[in-house]
């Protein structure tokens, strides 16, 4: 019988060394790295400078506390110490004034109490440990939260002017500081609500998560805006954002063509909830794909063009755009959640949808339909570009809803509409101007951008490049946005030459 050589039908047998748990002597690994080096000299003069700032807080804020025993204070760190690894957690601890949040780069907020400020001054004066000295060297200023800071640099007059009109005033959005679990948070919220009631400022927190401490506040005049800006509990006050559909660049119509209807016997199909302006009921073929409707817009304010266009793409995308690659040809139904009223004067009466109203409508529908439908399309947004430092309130609330109801929101990256439109690659100036708009910064949402399906030789994107109107990331904390891109129409950067994708409206085919 011939002997098999190595590599001719049998594998080489290699020795195995078995290491059992706890086998052998454990050796302590010596720590590495050098002692923390301070960013500046922390001498007596510098310590006294910080002590004076804390004393100013004690004298200006603490005596004015009514009904509460704590106040937020702003801490600015130097630019070199903006990284989280330099965060002064030991200096601002539970024993002194704990950190309760952060804002822009190098901006922290701490909870100040009379006892905590006294402890903080003692630490600043006398503590010589390497850790404390390093953290003291990070501090630029310790200061009060000002009304201007709460208004994000806007004047009270400008804020009132930008706020949408309500029943008896103008609707603003107010966020409170979050002191964390305990009596202090309940106390500042109760004191805030009490003072607003005394001044006749109507509050409404419906639509916002309870622990977000967010309110719609209706202000009748500049004096009430100013009063809110001075309340200790308030972290920010802004105009209430308006929600709009992401309106297509062109809607040239053509006569209807025959499109496939849904087989009545085929009930086992995926369904997308279209959260939009409504889906037309006048086309029998499209109506066959609509599995249900929840219409929350009054008849005089209905304009279903945008919602119908979106639904047509979901149901018949490959049929109306046969030359576009990568389109799913399987059947898909839609559920019509009509929440966005008409905002085009050429189409009839107009009204606005507030951010708070959208959130209320969404949660109401989710309570009923979330177990059945898991993908919800939101081709809507605001005109507010996302910050690189913090997430938009709308994105935070949408993430809360997605987590609570275990659904996924598909969200538009937003459209840039001011000519000249965006180049690719983006110019340095366009990186800020063309950033995604809220709520495209949703972490759990799937943010979608548009690619060009045509090739512009000049003054426009090349094929497969981002469309000139499609906004880009990054989002807050440099998260990657958009999450997904697909063909969504194209145009030249001067807005003259348009090449859309095809779908339908009530009037017929549209591009």
Regions found by a protein language model. Give the residues of each.
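Subtilisin-like peptidase catalytic core
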Residues: 184, 191-193, 203-204, 304-390, ...
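Extracellular S/T/G-rich loop segment that most often corresponds to the catalytic His/Ser-adjacent loop
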Residues: 278, 284, 430-511
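Subtilisin-like serine protease catalytic core
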Residues: 261-293, 297-354, 406, 419, ...
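Short secondary-structure boundary/capping segments
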Residues: 253-254, 287-292, 350-353, 359, ...
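Catalytic-core regions built around general acid/base machinery
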Residues: 393-406, 435-438
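Active-site neighborhood of phospho(di)ester-bond hydrolases with catalytic His/Asp-centered motifs
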Residues: 377-379, 409-414, 448-449
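Short, surface-exposed ligand-recognition loops at beta-strand->loop->(often short) alpha-helix junctions
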Residues: 71-84, 175-187
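Autoinhibitory propeptides
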Residues: 1-63, 88-170, 174-183, 190-263
